[in-house]
């Protein structure tokens, strides 16, 4: 059995790879490992709007109850809401059934510990080991020792909306906002929060039918929202993904504003308020060099991690940083939540736009995105580190870096899933970096022939 857990829980095509049987086993093992030896434990269960959610929830909950834990089912709710409410309700764990931005045929199961954080690799391995060993030493419970399922009646959604609203001071009156809910988990929470704060709210893709989640909508397909914002003269647009743990924005001219710009704007604002701990934001190696240049001007440090919001969070926790995130719109505000939170991000951004008295596009001028070129070099899995060993490749990388002279960079990343090495170049001249990236990729490919 290979490793079951990926970077974001267990994922696969529902009913084929992620079966009801596997969901039952994950519920049983997760509940046993995460609550071992405590009182009758409580586990919060939420999901996005996928048609397979009901099937997987039934199986997952059966597993949870079989080891004597209580399952509190809150229905359709954003992933970050489960992270927050697990803490608020003093639950022993939280589980989300969602495949985030993936197409509808996929689903996933992701656990949070009692503090609202994603599980460590060690805990995930313990859950997998229990399943692999066929639940050896797990007692079979009967009678009154079996757990109960509690259906929650909307209080969780209300509590999450109130929490999200509390993260900004004042209101959003006078702001005209377009929201794209991706027919996903934010179709109630985001709309209500913005309305209750006084914004004029226009919404698209907020009629989930179980199969339209992420379909030509949300943060992975923002084209309709870009058009809508301009057509309806909105001050800004905000696009969520299926489970609303990320958010991308649209300025009033219809331009897509990615996570790098959001980090720059929010980082500057936090510094102004004296809340940017250690004057630092945490980003990944894939963030645009333009962000580093912009932050340098603002006298803000950037610290880089591997790609993945779990690595960003690790770095933030280690050094108590206030904000970090990815280009994809996964932004973590550690003062507010323990994971990327699309609604909290959207509210921070909207509040900054309102309070600044500037247009959103003016605020975005804080940063100039450098042209970026990404070229794949085909490399056998056992030779993916050739760029670290081969003298000619190393010399070519050094030469390119020297010629870019601080206004560009070379980044090489082996793919974790395919026999590829990704060659990424940034610089001021698109034509030049395009030529250099293709040349370097070709050199790498020739060396492994």
UniProtKB/Swiss-Prot annotation:
EC number: 5.4.2.10
Function summary: Catalyzes the conversion of glucosamine-6-phosphate to glucosamine-1-phosphate.
Organism listed in the record: Clostridium botulinum (strain Hall / ATCC 3502 / NCTC 13319 / Type A)
Protein name: Phosphoglucosamine mutase
Residues modified to Phosphoserine: 100
Binding of Mg(2+), residues: 100, 241, 243, 245
Pfam families in UniProt: PGM_PMM_I, PGM_PMM_II, PGM_PMM_III, PGM_PMM_IV
GO biological process assignments: carbohydrate metabolic process; peptidoglycan biosynthetic process; UDP-N-acetylglucosamine biosynthetic process
Enzyme class: isomerase
Domain of life: Bacteria
Catalytic activity: alpha-D-glucosamine 1-phosphate = D-glucosamine 6-phosphate
High-level lineage: Bacteria, Bacillati, Bacillota, Clostridia, Eubacteriales
PTM annotation, UniProt: Activated by phosphorylation.
Cofactor section: Mg(2+)
InterPro entries: A-D-PHexomutase_a/b/a-I, A-D-PHexomutase_a/b/a-I/II/III, A-D-PHexomutase_a/b/a-II, A-D-PHexomutase_a/b/a-III, A-D-PHexomutase_C, A-D-PHexomutase_C_sf, A-D-PHexomutase_CS, Alpha-D-phosphohexomutase_SF
Similarity comment: Belongs to the phosphohexose mutase family.
Molecular function, one GO term: magnesium ion binding
Record keywords, A-Z: Isomerase, Magnesium, Metal-binding, Phosphoprotein
Active site (record annotation): 100 (phosphoserine intermediate)
Record-level GO cellular component terms: cytosol
